[in-house]
Design a protein with these regions (language model features):
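Charged, amphipathic alpha-helical linker segments immediately N-terminal to NTP-binding catalytic cores
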Residues: 3-57
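Conserved ASCE/P-loop NTPase catalytic core
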Residues: 36-171
Length: 171
């Protein structure tokens, strides 16, 4: 994949201020628990996946986790990682797929088709045009959700690439 333009969620200005004000008014006297239940109830209606609120909540917490946090005067990494474990056909992939679609931020890939180069990127040479960087999914999903379905099938090299990128914040 070659990205010519990347739009980050915080730079998008597609919010309707009137709708935000309506939500603010609606939530004014609600507790955090009531607000969260309203969000999860509406996600169940949107996704048509019932009984997987725990997965939706984990995905939302991961997406809205701050990228960096100032702690004791130092900037610390703050991005979140979530793993969904469970039996097959229990709604894990479909829940995150619907969440990614709703937030319009991220992608779901399968471990069978993932490679270290596909996750991080590679330098590619094109004859007579020089070199360019072919960015992988980790870079393309910066500040978005990247879900790897069947992550237990990733090779050790892929896990190493993911672990190093997660540890350092650099691909």
């Amino acid at each position: 994949l070659l990205a010519y333009e990347i739009e980050f969620p915080e730079e998008a200005h597609a919010f309707d201020p009137e709708k935000i004000l309506k939500l603010k008014t609606k939530f004014k006297d609600w507790s955090i628990k009531e607000r969260l239940n309203w969000i999860l109830d509406n996600f169940e209606k949107y996704s048509q996946i019932v009984g997987r609120r725990n997965l939706a909540l984990a995905g939302l917490l991961c997406f809205f986790t701050p990228t960096w946090v100032k702690f004791n005067g130092e900037m610390q990494r703050g991005w979140g990682n979530v793993i969904f474990c469970g039996d097959t056909t229990t709604g894990k992939s479909e829940t995150i797929r619907k969440l990614i679609r709703l937030l319009n931020a991220g992608m779901l890939i399968t471990a069978e088709t993932a490679s270290a180069v596909g996750l991080t990127g590679a330098a590619t040479q094109v004859s007579k045009e020089g070199w360019f960087v072919d960015w992988g999914f980790l870079v393309l999903c910066d500040r978005k959700l990247l879900a790897v379905d069947g992550a237990h099938k990733l090779s050790l090299a892929n896990w190493a690439a993911l672990a190093e990128a997660e540890r350092s914040g650099v691909v």
